[in-house]
Amino acid sequence: MAFMRLGSKSEAFHREGQTWLCTTGLVSDVTIEVGDMKFHLHKFPLLSRSGLLERLIEESSTDDGSGCVLSLDEIPGGGKTFELVTKFCYGVKIELTAFNVVSLRCAAEYLEMTDNYGEGNLVGMTETFLNEVFGNWTDSIKALQTCEEVIDYAEDLHIISRCVDSLAVKACADPSLFNWPVGGGKNATSGQNTEDESHLWNGISASGKMLQHTGEDWWFDDASFLSLPLFKRLITAIEARGMKLENIAMAVMYYTRKHVPLMNRQVNMDEQVIETPNPSEEDQKTCLEEIVGLLPSKKGVNPTKFLLRLLQTAMVLHASQSSRENLERRIGNQLDQAALVDLLIPNMGYSETLYDVECVLRMIEQFVSSTEQAGIVPSPCIIEEGHLVKDGADLLTPTTLVATLVDGYLAEVAPDVNLKLAKFEAIAAAIPDYARPLDDGVYHAIDVYLKAHPWITDSEREHICRLMNCQKLSLEASTHAAQNERLPLRVIVQVLFFEQLRLRTSVSGWFFVSENLDNPDNQHGANGGLLKPRGENVRERVSELEKECMNMKQELHKLVRTKRSWKNFTRKLNFKKKSECCKPKDQATPAI
């Protein structure tokens, strides 16, 4: 850590309680009060260094020559800083460091200790040392932290802006090229001037060891010790100098985890847990609301996992509505990057549902709206025998990914007995039909919901099944649906019909290929030898499809026969009851 020694005399003061006395033996002729501290001093050393003290002493002097009493309660830095100022005026040895130079510079300005009142006065000396401090990352961090104590004076003297600019330059520079002398987080605030911290401007330590850097995140920990207002100014300056938005986002995330420890309760075991203080929930809430506005606004820069965790913490802390809406909008715009487990947000409101489905619905609607405005539509695809076949571009478009995510989310929340049918349908219907190449996911979610809500009416079952397109079910899903007793009979018949139609089309196509393969005119030389095994495979496949088709026809006939038998039985039973009711009493069967 940089330092500068001023003065040459030995200690000339001693303290008695809250009073400082001079040991020179001369009687004090001026008493200066700073807060609850009293300094019994002499006029001449003060008059020769401070313009303010010169005026105050002249105004307070009496004709009888008695000592005067002055009050300097507004001096920057308080009694501790004025103690150093007093020693400087008396020529006693003091040491300027990154921890005291800012308050001394502000106090010197307040006391008007310019070179007009003696060469090498405190204003000039502290200004010279500040320029040295600004050349060093660790010292600049320490100095910026102390600005909090004298914020107004430091602002007027442009100390904060100069310090922030120097830090921004170093953070944006390549440390491997410039060898900025960086320190480690805790050492930056400990105030210990260890041997390892004694280094030159180029980063070479006094012991001959080169300071090590750990990549682009080397400055995150040091910056996290700043107060939120100063951290915001540093991030703004760094962003203005063109740092990558991804690095800025990571720095803000690091700061958030440190100052909003409630977020760390949701950290997975494989994630780094940052040691944090224990601020109040109100302080955490204030910090979170400020952080939301500090995050880069560009889509995809902030990890969706972090945004979802931040949103959940905002709900716990009852953050402002604008902050939560901001987070929901950010998450919605990049919902395709979310993981299912992170969407399972516990319900913090008055609703009876286990999860906050209203919040997720708003984010889905935001995503659909943003993609439609951008004109993003999934590439066309073909569904052949229940399997996706690519046609051109990759099918994993953002909209398709979100459709899969939403179907998985519906399957997770469907077992909640308090989840209303209307809300389930609203979430499923929020995804446009073109976003689902297959409807297997939404079918699975519907099946889970029907299983968890067996009391819903037949009309409601019919209504919820309209969310899926039976033509877009895979072969496996169709087979399951055809045997699913929870589905309405109309839906089962529809599934069987479309599956039979699909199989018939496939069989016709395979027969066409088989006939061409059997034609000897199409087999010549080596090509005939290659096509013969293929023809055998085609015949086997055709045989399998015919068997599957016959099985489905039999299942369909069984369902229809069962339904007809039940109707005939019911009709006969009703006819028998009516016949018995219509018999005359005198024709009743006599008792045996």
Curated annotation (Swiss-Prot):
Pfam families: BTB, NPH3
Cytoplasm among keywords: no
Domain NPH3 intervals: 217-502
GO biological process, one term: protein ubiquitination
Keywords assigned by UniProt, alphabetized: Phosphoprotein, Ubl conjugation pathway
InterPro entries from the UniProt entry: BTB/POZ_dom, NPH3/RPT2-like, NPH3_dom, SKP1/BTB/POZ_sf
The protein's annotated pathway: Protein modification; protein ubiquitination
Comment block on domains: The BTB/POZ domain mediates the interaction with some component of ubiquitin ligase complexes.
Name listed for the protein in its UniProt record: BTB/POZ domain-containing protein At5g03250
Taxonomic source organism: Arabidopsis thaliana (Mouse-ear cress)
Species classification: Eukaryota, Viridiplantae, Streptophyta, Embryophyta, Tracheophyta
